[in-house]
Every structure is written in structure tokens, then in C-alpha cells.
């Protein structure tokens, strides 16, 4: 069996490589996908991809495995970054990492390489099960690290080629393995935030592409102007961080895109404004549910799932009814559907209802 392993320079993908070698696989080649934007944005952040490659080189030498660097910066910019910028302009909250997996790691990568592989292995925290050539995507054992949310827009064809050997391991177990086999990157910290930014702050990325524009911050209940902000694109519904006003905490409740106004409420009023119903569209089903029971939804990456019912309306719009209120539902975000621990697929949030 011919196997390609995507190495990031981090501990997870390195342990994934070790796991495959331990299982006896020998025909292995590793790839590092260069998608960082630091070459373009070097003035606002450090450049971690050189450090990544140093670790990739060390790990591959340790296991005597060849590797190749694949440059996907142009593809990433055209297929993911432009999407994120357009969503921000519209006042939406994009999820670039979902499209990074769908369009780049398991999309453009296949197009770029000249070799064919039986299996693509990564260090993602998720599980793929195959029963009689019927593939399902499931949550990882480690529910805190689980990445099924970000894999929800893969196709069945993409999933059929993938293997995630870390799906049955906890992060603590992976760290332990890294120390036991003395990996060169055993003490390297986990990457944080959006996959292409590295050490660049998200707001700096937004500022670089969209600039700043002064606008008012208004208390939703009273209409009183409480302060100013530098552009609606820096804010998302439910956001608390960055609102530096007294008598808080304050939360973003609404955005007026045309007039560049951010509406906020304090914590007492904010907790009265949760939503139980919203519409989604552009659904990607990995496995469409046959029955409308035992379903749950994730509105954002994290452990929390909320039980729900779904109803298909015209034009393939779906109404989602949550069993409990959520306080940060924002257009442009993705709602991912689950049946127990199986990730069924996901859809883009269109608007909230009640």
C-alpha cells in the first residue's frame, strides 16, 4: 500500500507517521504543505514555516522517510482567503479552516502531486469508519481536540482516501508517545487559531485586507452611543473580547453593515437574546440523516453540541430548531450536524429567526 502523510512540523502529524510505521507500512512519503501567508504579511508577524520545515526534516530523518514541500500559497489565497475577505465585507463570520481542509489539504494537494496514493494520512483528531465501502466521519476519542467540525465539508470520495490514526488517542497519550520515542518536536506547542495565519493575529490580517473605518458602538436597548470602533468586519455576533467599555461585560448583538454600527448589550440583557431557530443553506451531507431524531448541532468548534430538529424548506434551505438557546449565532458561520458521534455534514448559517 502506497501512503502519503501530511506533516505540519507539529507533534500530532509526527506521531501519526510513527503510528503508521509501527503498523508495518513501508511505502511512505511525507509532504509539507506551504500555505502560510507570512511572505506577504511578514511585516506584521513572524515566519513559522521555516521552523516547521526544520522539524519536518528532523522527523523524516529520524524515521528515514522521504519528504517533499508542496507550495499551495496561490491556491490557498484564491480558494480560501478571498472567500474569507468577501464574507467579512458582507458582515458575516467566515470559517476558513473548513475550506482549508476541503479545498486545499484534500483538494489542491491531490491536484498538485503527480503520484497516486492508496491512503492519505494526517494528524487530525477524528475517525473514519468503513463498513462495506460505506464511509462515515466520527468524532475523536478526545472530544476537546476533536476536529470533525472542520472536516464536515469533505465529500465521501475525499473521506474514502483518508486515515486519521490519532482518532482513538487522547492528546495526553500523543504527548507521552512523542516523549517515549524522543521526537525532535516533542516539546513543541500546539498551533493556535486559523491554519494559514501562523503567529499573525487575525485582526492584523483583517486590517491588512480591509483597513479601518470609524463607526459607532450603540447600546441596543437605549440607542445610546457608548463609543467607537474601527470597522464592523472586526466583530462577530456574541463577541465579548475587544469591547473596552466600562460597566461591562458587553456583547455584540447586531451589526448594521450599511451604516457601520455595532450594537451591544450588557451581560444581563444579552442573556435574554439567545436564539433557538435559524436557517442554513449550501448544505454538504456526508451522510444525510434518514430520520429527524437523535440529531445535534455544533454552531462553532468546541465540545458543545445542542440537540436539534431540522426541516427542509424550499430552495434547499433548512430550518434548524435547537432544544436550547445559543447566544452567538452569526450569518456566515457553519452549523455542523451530528447523530451521536457521527458527523453527518454541515451548512452555512443564513440568518437567525427566533
From Swiss-Prot:
GO molecular function, one term: ATP binding
Cellular component annotations (GO), alphabetically ordered: cytoplasm
Record flagged with keyword Disulfide bond: yes
Active site: 100, 195
UniProt-annotated site: Interaction with tRNA, residues: 124, 333
GO BP field: tRNA modification
Alphabetical list of InterPro entries matching this protein: MnmA-like, MnmA-like_C, MnmA-like_central, MnmA-like_central_sf, Rossmann-like_a/b/a_fold, tRNA_2-thiouridylase_MnmA
Binding site for ATP: 6-13, 33, 123
Domain of life: Bacteria
Region feature Interaction with tRNA, mapped onto this chain: 145-147
UniProt subcellular location: Cytoplasm
SS bond list: 100-195
KW Nucleotide-binding (keyword) present: yes
Listed HAMAP family: tRNA_thiouridyl_MnmA (MF_00144)
Family in the record: Belongs to the MnmA/TRMU family.
Function, in words: Catalyzes the 2-thiolation of uridine at the wobble position (U34) of tRNA, leading to the formation of s(2)U34.
Protein name: tRNA-specific 2-thiouridylase MnmA
Species per Swiss-Prot/TrEMBL record: Borrelia duttonii (strain Ly)
